[in-house]
Amino acid sequence: MKRPTRRDFLRSAAAGSLAVPAMLRAHELEGQAQPAPGDRIRIALIGAGGQGSSDTRSALRVPGVELRAVADIYDGRLARAKEVWGSQVVTTRDYREVLARSDVQAVIIGTPDHWHARIATEAMAAGKDVYVEKPMVQKIDEGHGVVAAAAQHTRILQVGSQRVSSIVYAKARELFRSGAIGELNMVEAWINRNSAIGAWQYTIPPDASPQTVDWDRFLGHAPKRPFEPTRLFRWRNYRDYGTGIPGDLFVHLFSGIHYVLDAIGPTRVMATGGLRFWNDGRDVPDVMLGLYDYPKTASHPAFTMSLRVNFADGSGESQGFRFIGDSGVLTIGGPGVTLSRKPRPKEPGYSIDTFPLALQQQILEEYRTKYPPQNSVSSTSDEVYSPPSGYSDQYDHFVTFVNAVRSRTPVIEDATFGFRAAAPALLTNDSYFERAAITWDPEGMRRIRT
């Protein structure tokens, strides 16, 4: 039986309803004929933490992908790599040994954020294609260097915000471009969590020590300090190594928004929030709200956006994403993407109770003449488009990456796209800590200081 393709979904989802959701179709390459030996893609993983390992599992599901090497600064993760992927996998603490290998064509970078730009740049200079986790850079001033390196070395670089390869977001993009919601005026998104793991309280292995961890290599260009395993295994909590809520979560939302709308970024960034619950030594907020103004472009009208994250939400885990227009709303989440349209009344209505009675009667007569009663019924049903059970946009994202490595065709989420998604996230941090609104040039990708 022929497996449905991504294109099949986009065709079959041309119409849907709340009662009978249209089924989105994904890449389903598993089980097809294996690529010829010359088409095999040999990869290495640099940074074998939770995200890097998850990325590698998805990459290895793509036919023809083989794992050759793993680099990490904690010996326990190197041992685990051999347990999971076999004793033939070469392991090392030094990522430069991976970059020097001639049998590695592409690398996955799953390190803490403060290493992303440096390793990505060195990898491309070494002739490797790069899949780098989001955010692409930790600091604004690193962005142009990564963009330039990708162009100079003609390498494929794809950032790991998988929504850009999602069939759900592809459908939202199609609906937006068709005019389904009228003129966009606002976007809002939120992520709520209420668990220790959700707040980055990851487990610290009891054998972590200066003997099992290359502490100096972890620190890199960050300030020097004595060994402290909490800073390694919970690095997202610290500005020296991570990018807080915006770099971990907002950047996914920016990537999705920019893909759906063909947007390149806001011109104004404002943020507020605070450390409200997780007083564990972290130096970043656990509650954050960002506000953004996007200018009118050829692809979309001017709109305002709000993003919020709460790591101590007593209602539990939830998230939502809404594109709001004057004729409808696209909601991403739950079953997939939902198009809701509640038509605005054609009649303007009236508010006349405080007028003299004679004047009320006059206004009513004129109103009823101009707007006679309508006997028609308007539709307010939702259209729901759902992905198949078990769908993985992370897998689709690696299909996109591997296909690009093989064919040398560009990807959507390249270095420029990645920088334009990372920048407003990083500027959210700047706005919060500087307590000021920030102006950004999304075309030139530069902060404007006034």
Placement of each model-derived feature along the sequence:
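Beta-strand-loop-alpha-helix segment that lines the small-molecule cofactor/substrate pocket
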Residues: 112-113, 117-165, 179, 435
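Short, solvent-exposed loop/turn and secondary-structure capping segments
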Residues: 54-58, 80-83, 118-122, 142-143, ...
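N-terminal Rossmann-like NAD(P) cofactor-binding module of classical short-chain dehydrogenase/reductase
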Residues: 107-108
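N-terminal secretory signal peptides and thylakoid transit peptides that target proteins
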Residues: 1-17
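N-terminal Rossmann-like dinucleotide-binding module
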Residues: 16-85, 163-166, 257
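Contiguous beta-strand/loop segments that form the cofactor/metal-binding neighborhood of enzyme cores
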Residues: 171, 183, 188-190, 196-416, ...
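Conserved SAM-binding strand-loop segment of SAM-dependent methyltransferases
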Residues: 89-94
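Glycine-centered tight turns that cap/initiate beta-strands
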Residues: 64, 103, 180-183, 265
